[in-house]
Amino acid sequence: MKALLINGSPHANGCTFTALNIVAEELQKNGIETEIVHIGNKDIRGCIACGKCAELGHCVFNDMVNEVAPKFEQADGLVVGSPVYYAGPNGTLTNLLDRLFFSTPFDKRMKVGAAVVSARRGGTTAAFDRLNKYFTISEMPIASSRYWNMVHGHSAEDVMKDEEGVQIMRILGRNMAFLIRAIAAERERNGLPEKEVTRYTNFIR
């Protein structure tokens, strides 16, 4: 079993990575293999709604989105970490997630999702809520902790001084590992829940 962790910060070893690494360590202690991928300062463009992914099975723009897609497909869990930019996630990260979730045809149901956010001071809950939307629209159960998944600090060293934040990340890792194992066991016994054909309703006719 494996979890993929995406560091949405331009800083490879900053606050967001520090939080993700704590989660990864707990996942590993509980039998879950982990991989952390870094967005860094890569130029990841947004979705242009061209619809070519429906024909190709992948995004028409061959950048990091198509590199991450097979890793996501093979993973049992996905942790997305972001610094807070104006009370929201990093724009480069949301570009990646918009295209990653929309362009990939594989079934995401019952992959466990979790969001982690870091900030010097405020905006964390709004950013956290936005990231969770990717999971809930994809039938992905969300792993939680004893508080919303956030850390505070202006540097990686500051984050490690946020004792409550560090504890939140540890608990998140353990809870996510439990969910991944539980879902894998149930899937082995009874398979996935019944999948319905999507019904689309437009409000303007």
Regions found by a protein language model. Give the residues of each.
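N-terminal beta1-alpha1 ligand-phosphate binding loop
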Residues: 2-30
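Glycine-rich phosphate/pyrophosphate-binding loop and the adjoining helix
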Residues: 141-205
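A short beta-strand-loop structural module common to alpha/beta enzyme folds
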Residues: 32-42
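Helix-loop-strand module that forms the ligand-binding subsite of alpha/beta enzymes
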Residues: 56-147
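Short, hinge-like loop/turn segments at secondary-structure boundaries
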Residues: 51-55, 132, 161-162
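Cysteine-cluster motifs in flexible loop/terminal segments that predominantly coordinate metals
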Residues: 42-72, 199-205
